[in-house]
């Protein structure tokens, strides 16, 4: 970046009234002894053969999705992280149910664990943590991504960066330079594709169409393509209770879908609605189970349009489906 209105790409200079930084993030490995033995999620696409055993470090969607992939292909999978449950930004019930379901598929979780070092033992990597040691054929650092802002000359033109290199912005995605904005993974926070898309759309609308357009993170549907999958839109129960103390009803159900009864599979589905009691506005929809991303995509329309619990109750159910449970929830489990 040459100045507040100009960037250089190779030998070409491009100028504009506004500049938007959307350079994403990159994988990183924690600075621990033996870190050169660790792979990142980028490296996994270049494996020449399926490892017999895999340890993944990280509680986020990348590590959990790859855990499901490797377990499904027959690898022995261990997932380690420092917290008690995965997906720290998700609803508490989602986190708990997903961990239980993944464990039922044979995935081992080591929680409350911090990595101390990695060592090579023959053709195995020994993982040393404060919770003990074990061996795996490969070790994957899936500890998130860091902003890909190094070497862009951002600070030289006055753009303020955070400790991890993230671009510091206000609620309108504006940086410390009036004509420069930033969206997506490079600003830190939630690193999911729908969030970056929503930020970009809101920014474009505000600059060129509607000056009052804003980014509404709670209307952004997201999915985690684990086994089973997660779909969510709106506020978590924890967020809703914090912003609406004493005014939240929670509707929740857990069941085994009909398609799993004949093959006698143990997999269950969890569905949850978070509702503001005073006006019956649905604040959040959450699901763990088969087809969760597909179902949540449709429910995101309802939340964006301001659907109430009465709207859900009036909606006829398509039977027999799993999705019908969202419109058949009648009694709150928490008031």
Model-predicted regions and their roles:
Residues 1-18, 109, 116-126:
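Feature captures the FAD/FMN-dependent oxidoreductase FAD-binding
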Residues 21-82, 109, 155-157, 161-172, ...:
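Glycine-rich dinucleotide-binding loop and its adjacent helix/turn
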Residues 36-51, 134-209:
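FAD-site-proximal beta/loop scaffold in flavoenzymes
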Residues 3-4, 23, 40-42, 111-113, ...:
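Short loop/edge segments at beta-strand edges and connector loops
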Residues 45-46, 51-55, 61-126, 130, ...:
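Rossmann-like dinucleotide-binding cores of NAD(P)H-dependent redox enzymes
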Residues 13-24, 55-57, 77, 134-144, ...:
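Short hydrophobic core segments
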Residues 26-28, 160-162, 210-219, 244-251:
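A short alpha-helix-loop-beta-strand transition element characteristic
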Residues 225-236, 241-335:
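Flexible, glycine-rich terminal cap/loop adjacent to redox cofactors
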